[in-house]
Amino acid sequence: MSFEISREQYAGMFGPTTGDSIRLGDTNLFAKIEKDMTVYGDESKFGGGKCLRDGMGQSATELRRDNPKVVDLIITSAVILDYTGIYKADIGIRDGKIVAIGNGGNPSIMDNVDFIVGSSTEALSGEGLIVTAGGIDTHVHFITPAIAYSALENGTTTIIGGGTGPADGTNSATSTPGAWNIHQMLRAAEGMPVNMGIQGKAGGAIMDTTAEQIEAGAMALKVHEDWGATLSCIDHALETADKYDVQVSLHSDTLNETGFVEDTIKSIGGRCIHSYHTEGAGGGHAPDLMKVASKNNIIPSSTSPTNPYTVDILPEHLDMLMVCHHLDPKIPEDVRFADSRIRKQTIAAEDVLQDMGALSIMSSDTMAMGRIGEVIMRSWQLADKMKKQRGPLEGDSEYIDNNRIKRYISKYTINPAIAEGISDYVGSIEEGKYADLVLWEPAMFGAKPKMILKSGMIAYGVMGDSNASIPTTQPRTMRELFGLTGKSRQHVNMTFVSTYAYEHNIKEELGLERNVLPVHNVRTVTKKDMKFNSETPKIEIDPLTYDVTVDGKLITCDPARELPLAQRYLYTNLDKINILVYYKKIT
């Protein structure tokens, strides 16, 4: 016997379904559900009087030890927002990995069951929630361990960078120099609440200077102008990278002392490289570094300080830059060095290039001009700003922004994972990957997550007073949970190293307890592999006016005076926020 209910009632009970559109936070972005993999009338739902009970939605006979389809955790009826699509499904997690996405339940009484809920299964209600892959920040200065918690609080679960603490070299460059420092930082990573990967310092005129750092456990190399971004340094770093299958990140020569951007492109020679803060305010060939975004072998990223372009960007940047790069405001040459990097024309063009898909990755440059806890928030602020200024993307409409949403979520999930050689492990919601997942209430999307899973275990989330009678009593704050307690912290987190270090037992050599995994398939990556962000238009920058043209057309935008996901979320009692969430059929 069938029973019909309204879409509003259905959304209240089981969450939105196919054809419904959800507003993301207080932005003007709407995610339309493309498909629903659960079965109407057979939805799995936990609670008193609900169906996930013994002999009903929960199998009374299937054993975990005998049947690999029996999961450890089911997330029910979640809206998955990923580069693979925007859809609704149950998520099945076993041994810390996503083993099934579809319809979970009891195959004895339910049709079309993709994975089994048994007596061994925990339930997490995803009805009305959005689930995304944990964010990946590829531009992190390891200045203080506290950055990891700021990252988690905005949904970032993997950080890649370098440093040794608040040394001047680390304040400036994201590299950990030498085998001893790399080993110490690998040991330090044992206590971190996020996945980590370390970049060695590129330099020297022979391969061995960088090779010994890759062999010591660095997962990548970093070329930075403050240590010398000479053409020889770039060439030798890439030689090492090709030999060991690792990435090279490039902060190029702002002063053009050893060559211009064309010379750097020539020294790269068609090899894969990751270009940091490609607009140039964070550093790199002035004023025309953005030309590299035209090349298929160069993976261009942005950093959060200049995204989105607002009325406060320019005055904030000069002082930040002076501090981060150890410059002296009393020395005129240092001031001119800083001034050369802050150009409103290229900053304005950066927003548009991001929206076009010509810039592939978003990152933070944390504590060295950027804020690690704002990567995800600023990505969605930028997407909102671009929709308001440029209109819907091709194929989108007023209440359907799926193409733009897939473009922007790819910038901090799957694309950095591909660029750094870790996409087999993290970066998307796909079967076989580790369950590093972020759960959001739609009204809070992009600003403050509800809960964060690391390798399938609840690690961080909003929790009430621990002496209260229920878990939702004020004050409700983000807190560490059992996934980050005791030895579980090591078990649910990953340290990424070079394949050489992995095969030569770096884990055993250093006595590491974390899940140590090798990076691979890096050197064959091109910009065409960047999901929804693979455009390679011809980009030119006028050396006198700094105007930016794309395929001969001037591109720019106005600075924003007001942004979503801002003070409403940071200085308001969150329980009193009332943001309209749309669950309606879009025809």
Swiss-Prot record:
InterPro entries: Amidohydro-rel, Metal-dep_hydrolase_composite, Metal_Hydrolase, Urease_alpha_N_dom, Urease_alpha_subunit, Urease_AS, Urease_asu, Urease_asu_c. GO terms for molecular function: nickel cation binding; urease activity. The active site is at H325. This is Urease subunit alpha. One of its GO terms (cellular component) is cytoplasm. It comes from the Bacteria. Its cofactor is Ni cation. Keywords: Cytoplasm, Hydrolase, Metal-binding, Nickel, Plasmid. Its EC number is 3.5.1.5. It is an enzyme of class 3 (hydrolase). Pfam families: Amidohydro_1 (PF01979), Urease_alpha (PF00449). The keyword Ion transport does not apply. Ni(2+) 2 binds at K222, H251, H277. Belongs to the metallo-dependent hydrolases superfamily. Urease alpha subunit family. Pathway: Nitrogen metabolism; urea degradation; CO(2) and NH(3) from urea (urease route): step 1/1. It catalyses: urea + 2 H2O + H(+) = hydrogencarbonate + 2 NH4(+). One of its GO terms (biological process) is urea catabolic process. Binds 2 nickel ions per subunit. Ni(2+) 1 binds at H139, H141, K222, D365. Heterotrimer of UreA (gamma), UreB (beta) and UreC (alpha) subunits. Three heterotrimers associate to form the active enzyme. Its main location: cytoplasm. Residues 134-572 form the Urease domain.
